[in-house]
Amino acid sequence: MKGDKKIIAHLNKLLGNELVAINQYFLHARMFKNWGLMRLNDKEYHESIDEMKHADRYIERILFLEGIPNLQDLGKLNIGEDIEEMLRSDLALELAGAKNLREGIAYADSIHDYVSRDLMIDILADEEEHIDWLETELDLIARLGIQNYAQAQILERKE
């Protein structure tokens, strides 16, 4: 089915956001793991996989609309050097992605492409949950202090 060129452009922009998120969250996960912060590793790894699933959904929709998924224009990863910087980097990426999603949703609605709109609404719900989690973690860091927060992220290793 031939799709609207502008909706395909929106979907490709969102795909690009997801591709950056996959890599950024995966690297952050492995950095957390290396530091022994297994709870943060597990959460970041899970988020990376979720972003991969979102990317897959965008690719399928773009192909259905007879567009070409753009996997080449990768944005810049913003890799933090400490826990708080990493979470802030992830939050900035999620907030930018949510803004792009809202723009895409509004455009899809205006051209009556309800399937693309519903896809983006579904993904926006996931992104908002991640934003809420990141904001909560940053609030905990501010209230508890980074040392207490970091200590709470350590799980006993199973031998």
From Swiss-Prot:
Ferritin-like diiron domain span: 1-145
Cofactor binding comment, as recorded: Binds 1 heme b (iron(II)-protoporphyrin IX) group per dimer.
GO cellular component, one term: cytosol
Any GO BP: iron ion transport
PROSITE patterns reported in the protein's UniProt record: BACTERIOFERRITIN, FERRITIN_LIKE
Sequence positions that bind Fe cation 2: 51, 94, 127, 130
Cofactors that this protein relies on: heme b
Assembly and oligomerization: Homooligomer of 24 subunits, arranged as 12 dimers, that are packed together to form an approximately spherical molecule with a central cavity, in which large amounts of iron can be deposited.
Protein name: Bacterioferritin
Organism: Serratia marcescens
Gene that specifies this protein: bfr
